[in-house]
A protein has these predicted regions:
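Acidic, metal/ion-coordinating pockets
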Residues: 1-230
Length: 230
């Protein structure tokens, strides 16, 4: 997510969803050498918010001060192709939870990683939990590696009584990146891999889709999350 100005980079994104003010914060764990040089040469050090505990904690505090009842932190992080979070991810996630985030949503590894609850304490000393989805996998890309064609959409039910929030159902929709050739050119379509195959999908592609679903289910086997049923 690129920020065009310093003011834009400093602003907290808060959207009201079903009368609940929700803050959305996004950060990137690391940049390529090319990206770093581009930011330095342009003087736009604010263009890509980098993930560090101090910055994120400060932004969470500002979000709360501006009225956010729910804080969602999304991160591009981790090691591509790995099915488990790194120690650095775990350390940062716990710091984000301790700072008061309610949900952490990761991407960047290209493959689905587990979902877990992180425990921390509120300012008043009461216990609280943060939902952490380490990586949602791939929603859309050109790669045809097995894990890279699988992803998931996260669905959360969150209630707010004016003071505290509580989680209801935590579920997901597994997805598959279907590639087919039409008039000599490849077309890509994202489909729910737990549903019936769409018209025109070959038996071979149906087999790949079933394999993608198994990959997701294996990754989430011990996670507190279920496939969405409606």
């Amino acid at each position: 997510m690129l920020q065009n100005t310093q003011e834009e980079a400093s602003a907290i994104c808060i959207r009201t969803l079903d009368n609940v003010p929700v803050a959305f914060l996004h950060y990137t764990e690391a940049l390529s050498g090319t990206g770093k040089k581009a930011m330095k040469s342009s003087g736009a050090s604010y263009a890509v918010p980098l993930a560090n505990a101090e910055t994120i904690s400060a932004d969470i505090r500002r979000a709360r001060e501006q009225g956010a009842a729910v804080v969602v932190v999304s991160l591009n992080w981790g090691t591509s192709g790995t099915s488990k979070p790194t120690n650095a991810q775990r350390k940062l996630a716990q710091a984000i939870a301790d700072a008061g985030a309610d949900v952490i949503v990761g991407a960047g590894t290209r493959v689905v990683q587990p979902v877990t609850w992180l425990t921390h304490k509120n300012a008043d000393g009461t216990a609280a939990q943060t939902l952490c989805a380490w990586s949602l996998g791939s929603l859309l890309n050109e790669s045809r590696k097995d894990g890279n064609v699988a992803g998931m959409l996260l669905q959360l039910q969150i209630s707010w009584d004016g003071q505290n929030i509580s989680f209801g159902q935590v579920s997901y929709t597994p997805t598959y990146i279907w590639r087919q050739k039409v008039d000599g050119a490849y077309q890509y379509r994202v489909v729910a891999s737990d549903q019936s195959a769409p018209n025109g999908m070959s038996e071979e592609q149906q087999g790949y889709m079933a394999k993608a679903l198994r990959t997701i289910q294996n990754a989430l086997a011990d996670s507190p999350i279920t496939i969405r049923t409606k």
